[in-house]
Curated annotation (Swiss-Prot):
The lineage of its organism: Eukaryota, Metazoa, Cnidaria, Anthozoa, Hexacorallia. This is Toxin PhcrTx2. GO terms for molecular function: ion channel inhibitor activity; potassium channel regulator activity; sodium channel regulator activity; toxin activity. InterPro entries: BDS_K_chnl_tox, Myo_ane_neurotoxin_sf. GO terms for cellular component: extracellular region; nematocyst. It comes from Phymanthus crucifer (Red beaded anemone).
Amino acid sequence: ALPCRCEGKTEYGDKWIFHGGCPNDYGYNDRCFMKPGSVCCYPKYE
């Protein structure tokens, strides 16, 4: 996934395109929506 950063955060997350939310299988517990069609998911998946 591409790196992204939500407003107010210092660390980077994973950007997913064309998802209504974050995929379930990566352990994400936070997110913010970026421009239409992309979402930034935290924490970054290793």
